[in-house]
UniProtKB/Swiss-Prot annotation:
Belongs to the HMBS family. Pathway: Porphyrin-containing compound metabolism; protoporphyrin-IX biosynthesis; coproporphyrinogen-III from 5-aminolevulinate: step 2/4. The gene is hemC. GO terms for molecular function: hydroxymethylbilane synthase activity. HAMAP family: Porphobil_deam. One of its GO terms (cellular component) is cytoplasm. This is Porphobilinogen deaminase. The porphobilinogen subunits are added to the dipyrromethane group.
Amino acid sequence: MLKIGTRGSLLATTQSGHVQEWLQQKGYEAELHIVTTQGDVNMAPVERIGVGVFTQALREAVDRGECEIAVHSFKDLPTAADERFDLVVPQRQDVREALIARDGLTLKELPEGARVGTSAPRRISQLRAMRPDLDIRPLRGNIDTRMGKVTSGELDAVLLAYAGLVRAGYAERATEVFDPEVFMPAPAQGALAIEAVKGTEAAKAIALLADGPATAATRAERTVLSQLEAGCTAPVAATSHWEGEQLVVRGGVFALDGSRQLIAQAQGAASEAEELGRAVSKELFAQGAADVLAAE
């Protein structure tokens, strides 16, 4: 029986439940094992409590043998690889950002000064560029908590990853889903990262779940992030799509006040994923990314 380590939130257990089902389809018995992380109990902004706060506890639980497999939202993982583990990317969910607003409103329809909840610098900077009049409020908590702030009237809208809404069964709550070229998502958004200790039976099992296109796309996107030496809380975005067998990678660096948006793009074969990510980051540096990031 393989134990799958997961955070206890609805989204996390739903995601890990999918991994459990996929492993069972491959002939492996698996069960979920809840691991409490510091990020689940500390409601301070992620920028303050540290990159990887949601993932480190899961990795340590695997390392000490409490469970054999860890399931992460790939966008939450630090960019540096952890050499203890094999990492597999299964088939990817929707990469887009979603708005959940009162009265079915879209971003353009929100009234002047509307209160919008998000703590992600990447989202804040793009929101300010599109709607500088908005009152952007900090937001933490699970999906239910975040959506509840709109239902209660505390906020007029919140921004969330559409993939999380879909996985948790709340897709219909989205009042607007943004084209990734209009509102750029986090690198590896919509993708899961499944880890197991190298050389173990669990590592063999998760290898069966690997998806080639998702692996190449997320590698390119996360290379943009790592080359910029920016963490998962920086105002950096990356997305990609396929044009035939060509992978098209776009990256963005944004000033937190919305005053500057740097965008770069590269395309090539899946085998060149890392090179594409480096090419995008090189172009962003040429446009002044270092100055924009230093100012944050």
